Amino acid sequence: MNDSLSRLPREPADRLTKPFMRFLRIEATAGIILLLSTLLALGLANTAWSSSFLAFWEMPAGVRLGDIGIYRSLKHWINDGLMTFFFFVIALELKRELVLGELRNPRMAALPVAAALGGMAAPAGIYLLLVGGGPGASGWGTVMSTDTAFVIGCLALLGSRVPGSLRLFLLSLAIFDDIGAILIVAVGYGEPLNWVALGTGGLGFAFVAGIALLGIRSIPVYFAMGSAIWLAFDASGVHATLVGVILGLMTPARRWVSEIRLHAILDRVIAHPPGDHRSRDTAARSDLHRAGVATREAVSPIERLEIALHPWVAFAIMPLFAVSNAGIPIEDANFDVPLTIAIVVAFVVGKPAGIVLFSFLAVKLRLASRPEQLSWSLLAAGSLLTGIGFTMALFIAELAFEPELLIPVKLGVLGASVISAALGFMALTLLTSPNRR
């Protein structure tokens, strides 16, 4: 008996939701790992080993080939190098949702886009209003981002009570937020531009597009090209993590081999396996090799790369980023400084206010559609979680602020993340409790 007949048939919707649910499961677990990494960094930064711990991340590291050498601090390699993979995976997820997921509908995609714009504009405006022209005014980009892993981790604690429409809305919003933030970093917080290096990087992207059109599908080739483009952007003055965003959005979302062709190739292998007396062994092995290629290429490049990279990003790169950036000597800090207060208010108040306002305007102006399962009260409660800017906010803060301002800034980010997580969790718990349904 065919074993597949004993299983439920797969519906087309399963092809869309299965990768999405796998993404959520990984992100939920990653949120816990991120929290533990943050606590570890905070603990070590406030012990007798504080100086050694903080100095470790400033150690230079690099490679030299003849007269050419590339040396950066360990923190730089993490923040600019490894975090490129984070943004690459984020861009892959966005591309898949826009091409294959629910966001294929332009009006459905417009809602998280509008919400993300509000979630960036309102906190930046509040921050500038509170800081004025004082120290740290140029750091307005810090309050514009959302920590995807922590937001999904908070939703995971509520389990299945949270509707899928809210999960998708917040995930899409966080992705648009992060991409918007990295674009602002690339433009607003870069160094003076080296146009030769920038042009070289642009030619690299053109080359990648060209070999993709020629049908070259070798991931090592694209990795080598991506590395070369990253080096060019690192030398150009534009923040090199932008390379991850662009390459992620350039990655094909369609598979090369259809299911019909895959089944035909596999049927040929099954009918004439290697060693079968009715087929020549060389031809059968050629068919077997073709089946291996077809099996791999029946999965889209986006999904293959997500499967390969997401665990590394979620369980290695992001925790390493948190450990290297979240070390804040509490004894040297002062929560009462205006900068800290401005960051807390911008995240806790500005984020949800901007998201709700822009979402409401987009729906009322018929620019966007709101899913029926996503009530305004749920949207507002979920938006409270977007004040968790933690890892992304720390990432931008390292670029936007002078070193002497980083301690109060990091405390503001940490305080805002804790407050936003508590408020969002309590609001969603009340709204999704069985007594209210």
From Swiss-Prot:
This protein's record includes keyword Transmembrane: yes
Membrane topology: Multi-pass membrane protein
Origin superkingdom: Bacteria
Residues spanning the membrane: 29-49, 74-94, 111-131, 139-159, 168-188, 196-216, 229-249, 307-327, 341-361, 376-396, 411-431
GO CC field: plasma membrane
Cited Gene3D superfamilies: Na+/H+ antiporter like domain
UniProt keyword list: Antiport, Cell inner membrane, Cell membrane, Ion transport, Membrane, Plasmid, Sodium, Sodium transport, Transmembrane, Transmembrane helix, Transport
A Pfam family annotated for this UniProt entry: Na_H_antiport_1
Gene Ontology biological-process entries: regulation of pH
InterPro entries: Na/H_antiporter_dom_sf, NhaA
Gene Ontology MF terms in the entry: sodium:proton antiporter activity
Chief location of this protein within or outside the cell: membrane
Catalytic activity line of the entry: Na(+)(in) + 2 H(+)(out) = Na(+)(out) + 2 H(+)(in)
Location of the protein in the cell: Cell inner membrane
Protein purpose: Na(+)/H(+) antiporter that extrudes sodium in exchange for external protons.
Family designation: Belongs to the NhaA Na(+)/H(+) (TC 2.A.33) antiporter family.
Name this protein carries in UniProt: Na(+)/H(+) antiporter NhaA
Upper lineage: Bacteria, Pseudomonadati, Pseudomonadota, Alphaproteobacteria, Hyphomicrobiales
